[in-house]
Amino acid sequence: MLGSGNEEMSTLPGLNQIQLEGFCRFIDRGLTEGLFKFPKIEDTDQEIEFQLFAETYQLLEPLINEKDAVYESLTYSAELYVSTGLIWKSSRDIKKQTIFVGNIPLMNSLGTSIVNGIYRIVINQILQSPGIYYRSELDPNGISVYTGTIISDWGGRLELEIDKKARIWARVSRKQKISILILLSAMGSNLSEILENVCYPEIFVSFLNDKDKKKIGSKENAILEFYRQFACVGGDPVFSESLWKELQKKFFQQRCELGRIGRRNMNQKLNLDIPQNNTFLLPRDILTAASHLIGMKFGMALLDDINHLKNKRIRSVADLLQDQFGLALVRLENMVRGTICGAIRHKLIPTPQNLVTSTPLTTTYESFFGLHPLSQVLDQTNPLTEIVHGRKLSYLGPGGLTGRTASFRIRDIHPSHYGRICPIDTSEGINVGLIGSLAIHARIGIWGAIESPFFEISERSKRIRMLYLSPSIDEYYMVATGNSLALTRDIQEEQIVPARYRQEFLTIAWEQVHLRSIYPFQYFSIGASLIPFIEHNDANRALMSSNMQRQAVPLSQSEKCIVGTGLECQVALDSGVSAIADHEGNIVYTDTDRIFLFVNGDTLSIPLTIYQRSNKNTCMHQKPQVHRGKFIKKGQILADGAATVGGELALGKNVLVAYMPWEGYNSEDAVLISERLVYEDIFTSFHIRKYEIQTHMTSYGSERITNKIPHLEANLLRNLDKNGIVILGSWVETGDVLVGKLTPQMAKESSYSPEDRLLRAILGIQVSTSKETCLKLPIGGRGRVIDVRWIQKKGGSSYNPETIRISILQKREIKVGDKVAGRHGNKGIVSKILSRQDMPYLQDGEPVDMVFNPLGVPSRMNVGQIFECSLGLSGGMLDKHYRITPFDERYEQEASRKLVFSELYEASKKTSNPWIFEPEYPGKSKIFDGRTGNSFKQPAIMGKTYILKLIHQVDDKIHGRSSGHYALVTQQPLRGRAKQGGQRVGEMEVWALEGFGVAHILQEMLTYKSDHIKTRQEVLGTTIIGGTIPKPTDAPESFRLLVRELRSLAMELNHFLVSEKNFRIHRKEA
């Protein structure tokens, strides 16, 4: 963010800045630090020494561009070259060589990486910051137990605990603890040093007996005692160097390495002056921590709030990539050490080129981007989704929390979150509160803390200064809130203002204020900042709106919103979906594929994205917005991308809506829509699906791609060319063959003809047949073939098979079952598409496009949609667009309502339509029934609302099954649309059928429509001949499975039939 010295003006930071800064920090510092830690490697005889020279590493430019990497399923990476040296100690000869170490995936200008042709992004993680934290808990007797927990940079914990006798223990686990004196002696301190450097020596002396004095008499005795309690399996250990190394590896390395951030936190918390480069836990740290713990017991210090952001740190993309780089260098070290020993054993002369291989680094980063929980496939549903995905903050992941163990206190909003983590935008479900979003003005500092900007208020100087403060600093200042959120200082500050100080809200004089917020949007994420009139909505509905805006699909004809917040331009710009001019010049030529720009005597070709598939199967497409001969300035928009218009974010459409009931078709969040939305392609979207198939080398030969497929109808093969691949531009339906493929296999003995058996018996010839393994279009995949790609890898081995990739474009109009939503959490499913003449219409004869249920507003308390609806009506009439900053009530009361009514009044005057604003019921109007022409009894709210079409579409969900596969164990239909599964009649469904007394339907559902093998086979034949469906006579397979499982537990279960006459029992096996 940039601040002006004379004016209170600021610009938003780059929304991708958090990702780009992290990756640049890794390239600038992380690579050098990792290479400097690489040790010198010697052979067993210490005659040869290998080392890396970290000062002279090189990163080469990628050989391919981003688009080619995506199209060819490659990784957009740079080659890393490092200077190495091999030294012969006897002759002091040195052989230097620059060697290729491996590939490092790069980050593009949008903050994403391309790995195997897929856009991926690394999520920032929130972890407990290394350091020491004091807390108090009650024991079973109700007595307070004070503890100090030291958290290492590895995540290991060492807990200092003081009991009721004022004895201090070091606890490693719940059951294991040891005296702090033994721990300090094992770390190298003697008793006199301990007593000299502690604040309360008499307490340490009080619980020291003769036995303990013997244990801490020397460092060796203390180490033996420490090892005996924590690491010894059995026997009486003897001190040795290997024992000390084992103890270091098992205990000290994991629990005592603080790291750079941990050392800083320890120094600040305990008032120490230990150098920053000393990142290991020292005896002085433990002594000072013990003194603080004793003072805590006597009420001389404060407990720590573990959920405060000052006690958290952000593990950014730089830290994750650096950790993986260190892991790769450890693997490289082991590989080099083994290669040197092998070369000496076989009396070979090693060279740096033979010792170093690129496999450790390349495979480490491939596995990280492909398998790590914090490396995710980029959500490319729309431009907003791409931006928001890179700004997520997660408590989950390695070293973090889990969704099932996290408490409510961790999930809840903390006062330190304000201005740093959005209090609204989080995921729904089990991860609620654990995945947040960075506030729009926040940034990550060099120490891993989230910093928020403030304006400093100084009486001495009139110059405004903007500060970025961490959570540990701003809580000590008086921060003004409320009316001080005004955008200008023209408003006279009141004498008494509300302020925030140390997580409390106070009312103080203006002279006592130190800082004030810079913008009303400062507290919210990008998703929440795009909601107009958000202050009039319930927080739960604002949360839903933030999530649903990320689910909106780009429409074929985008339209920017009439009522917005002003951030739409920034989101569209930083998303990178629009083509921006890098130079000024004249447009020479333009078409749908590229734009030619004449700059300083040269002609630059600017390629455009044409019908490219995103990770969410939506369509990414750029449309030129400039014409031939036009002069273009630097930074001007050349082409709009998906879901952008004129450089602004455009996720939906402004449609005319009315809030009224209509024959029950809009009850319970159902939505009634007009057929105009279908015929005029108002909510039509394009979706691109990718289908691929590979050819492998089998034990009976290689698979063949061909258009001659036996036993298949010619109609299914009509779109194949002579090579057996679908023709570009073909229209394909469900079941059509996209790629014809035959897989060779051996035929069974019983299927051989007499001639084949004779040949096998006389000549030993193996007769083989081929199995049809074609790529067929699955259910719901109808569309137009827009791309065919045959990727042939060099070598053609079975490990690098050939891949054929087909892309199919679908045009989807809005239909019954699709999900639509507004920007206020008002969502619904399309229930009926009504003809235009039957839709309710306004007083000027215009039919409405959508009818919402008015009962969905008051109970959900999202009144912002009513303000937007009425203001959108006036904007549509006046051809105006509004950009409303939230919390406009900071100027005056009822500011939003006054704005809306004044604009409605102006629209009614200028258009000479008095029904737009009627004083008797402002904002409402009489609406007429399109079927009868009569007006409805009560006036209703109507206007223009910005409606989104979400990615939850009926074409992806609707499913039916007549017959299909059954599970092998339970013999019941499979589950899921992808497996052509059936519906499950569960416990509650059985209750419902029982309640209606439909015994025969219930029997059908539980037997031959489900898992009664014998009867369901007989049903088909009797249905064909028109016979009576047989009744099942024995138990279904699920009951048999229950019996078998009980038998596996040594329990026998049988059922018996009792006759009515003599009650004799006839045993029948289950």
From Swiss-Prot:
Keywords from the UniProt entry: Chloroplast, DNA-directed RNA polymerase, Nucleotidyltransferase, Plastid, Transcription, Transferase
Tagged with keyword Cell inner membrane: no
Locations listed in the record: Plastid, Chloroplast
SUPFAM superfamilies: beta and beta-prime subunits of DNA dependent RNA-polymerase
GO biological process: DNA-templated transcription
InterPro entries per record: DNA-dir_RNA_pol_bsu_ext_1_sf (IPR042107), DNA-dir_RNA_pol_su2 (IPR015712), DNA-dir_RNAP_su2_dom (IPR007120), DNA-dir_RNAP_su2_hyb_sf (IPR037033), RNA_pol_bsu_bac (IPR010243), RNA_pol_bsu_CS (IPR007121), RNA_pol_Rpb2_2 (IPR007642), RNA_pol_Rpb2_2_sf (IPR037034)
Keyword Chloroplast: yes
EC number: 2.7.7.6
Enzyme class: transferase
UniProt GO MF annotations: DNA binding; DNA-directed RNA polymerase activity; ribonucleoside binding
Any one GO CC term of the record: mitochondrion
Record's catalysed reaction(s): RNA(n) + a ribonucleoside 5'-triphosphate = RNA(n+1) + diphosphate
Record function comment: DNA-dependent RNA polymerase catalyzes the transcription of DNA into RNA using the four ribonucleoside triphosphates as substrates.
Subunit composition and interactions: In plastids the minimal PEP RNA polymerase catalytic core is composed of four subunits: alpha, beta, beta', and beta''. When a (nuclear-encoded) sigma factor is associated with the core the holoenzyme is formed, which can initiate transcription.
Family statement drawn from the similarity comment of this UniProt entry: Belongs to the RNA polymerase beta chain family.
Protein name: DNA-directed RNA polymerase subunit beta
Organism: Phaseolus vulgaris
Gene: rpoB
